[in-house]
């Protein structure tokens, strides 16, 4: 984990654009589960993170619509990055609660996720993530509660 955080260090806490955003995308794309889902980051700042993923058959459940776990994972990924980005390297942002509502079915196309802060405090943050489909209609909405932990927090005590 420390290696990944060191890679992010030059970028954290700032709005990224151009070449910096491309460099950060390369780092983010290398992250295991995010890479498996195909999450691509389009905008990263301390007040908003936007990402997308293209729907493909392996992300769908047997009825042919996007699996609920994809939405939940997208909420977790985008909001976690947003929370950590806002901390600006002052600690770790660790998800503690994820509540995602599935509103409309999606069978194909692109999902766009936008994370914005509802609350940012000393010990916790809450981020709302709206996920829209290609026609602009909301497909899902999630809320991630994040614990702000000091750097070097042990896994268990």
Give residue spans per PLM region.
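Terminal targeting signals and extreme-terminal segments of soluble enzymes
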Residues: 1-157
